Regions:
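Short, conserved beta-strand segments within well-ordered enzyme catalytic domains
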Residues: 46, 61-63, 72-76, 102-106, ...
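An N-cap/entry alpha-helix motif that binds or orients negatively charged groups
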Residues: 1-69, 164, 171-211, 347-349, ...
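Alpha/beta catalytic cores of nucleotide-metabolism and tRNA/nucleoside-modifying enzymes
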Residues: 1-46, 267-357
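A generic secondary-structure signal marking the coil-to-beta-strand transition
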Residues: 21, 69-73, 122, 150
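Glycine-rich active-site/cofactor-binding loop and its immediate structural neighborhood
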Residues: 70-113
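Short beta->alpha linker loops
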Residues: 29-30, 107-111, 132, 233, ...
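A gly/proline- and charged-residue-enriched helix-loop-helix capping module
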Residues: 97-119, 123-137
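Alpha/beta enzyme core
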Residues: 80, 94, 115, 119, ...
Length: 357
């Protein structure tokens, strides 16, 4: 069967992946309400396009934290790519870079910072958590900067771990031979095995539940790299991020994997854009599956969108080429949608374009 959209890739990936890996990638917290709502929010809005406008020359290029991008799109941080394909993050970084897109490397990667930057052909951001061991956090920041990462993405919505019941039932753990490569040489490179989710036990033992805004300032003081705060769904937190040294926020609910019944990211995006004003760049993730989804997010004020799970579906189906095809599909759909909205470029996408159904 020809794979012609991202839903096709998900269906194909489910057939290829072991159940434990597929459930880990695809699941949400508890009843998965937020997971579903992230998608449904796009379907609740229609595009009120304009006609008889010259769209013969279109530009989709963007600039994120000073870094040029061929699209207003970046690869969102996700853990454990080698569950999907033996080359893991090496393949996803290469596919994104070859298309002029930013790749965000997770702290919880199965390839190290240095390995990924060695093969990356485009800009890389580094996502991190604040560990109870601040020295370990500092070391990761220093390694990311030394390797050539362009920004730090601090995940702030996982101080404690959301309950993903599929992982609990599957007793999720990393298969033999896979480790958290950025933490090799420490006792934290392997996930525990046993009853329940090994990842849940890992997070609860290592991540600092006392994380607060002072830690954002501390992180910014460690480096000249811009700091992105990822996991914001309330406008007042965007204001706080600006006041404590962040350069950008990602409107995100962790893909519906942390607090179930949290709002869909598209629903809260406009209020956060308004609160941020010109003090922060605002990006968003959650539920992006079509070019029209990207148009809606941009029209409501996002500078760019993060794409997560579909990247892993592409990786599982056909490695680097699969990731590349997923990104190419989104590029083609976005270009077509922008034109059909009567826009010649991203600057022509305004809030009036997006209306409730």
């Amino acid at each position: 069967m020809a794979l012609i959209n991202l839903f096709d890739y998900q269906e194909a990936a489910e057939k290829r992946l072991p159940k434990m890996a597929y459930d880990y990638y695809s699941s949400g917290a508890h009843d998965e309400v937020t997971l579903r709502e992230n998608r449904a929010a796009f379907d609740r809005r229609s595009l009120h396009y304009r006609v008889l406008r010259d769209v013969s020359a279109r530009s989709l290029q963007a600039k994120l934290l000073g870094t040029p991008s061929q699209l207003p799109l970046f690869v969102a941080p996700m853990a454990f790519h080698r569950l999907a394909h033996e080359r893991g993050e090496l393949a996803t970084a290469k596919a994104a870079g070859d298309r002029g897109l930013i790749f965000t490397l997770s702290t919880m990667a199965t390839c190290s910072i240095e390995e990924v930057l060695n093969v990356a052909t485009g800009p890389v951001w580094f996502q991190l958590y604040v560990y109870r061991d601040r020295a370990l956090t500092r070391e990761l920041v220093q390694r990311a900067a030394a390797a050539g990462c362009r920004a730090l993405v601090l995940t702030v919505d996982a101080q404690v771990f959301g309950v993903r019941e599929r992982d609990v039932r599957n007793r999720f753990h990393l298969p033999e031979g896979l480790e958290v490569k950025n933490l090799l040489g420490t006792e934290n490179a392997s996930l525990p095995k046993g009853a329940g989710s090994g990842l849940g036990a890992y997070v609860e033992s290592l991540f600092d539940p006392a994380l607060d805004w002072a830690d954002v300032e501390w992180l910014a003081s460690l480096t000249d790299l811009p700091v992105v705060v990822k996991g914001v769904v309330h406008p007042e937190d965007a204001v706080m991020a600006a006041e404590h040294g962040a350069s950008a926020v990602v409107v995100s609910n962790h893909g519906g994997r942390q607090l179930d019944t949290a709002p869909a990211t598209l629903d809260v995006l406009p209020s956060i854009v308004d609160a941020a004003g010109d003090r922060l760049e605002v990006m968003m993730d959650g539920g992006i599956r079509r070019g029209t989804d990207i148009v809606k997010a941009l029209a409501l004020g996002a500078r760019a969108v993060g794409v997560g799970r579909p990247i892993l579906w592409g990786l599982a189906v056909d490695g680097e080429d699969g990731v590349g095809h997923v990104l190419d599909l989104l590029h083609a759909e976005l270009d077509k949608a922008v034109a059909l909205c009567g826009a010649a470029g991203l600057k022509d996408l305004g809030r009036e374009l997006v209306q409730p159904c």
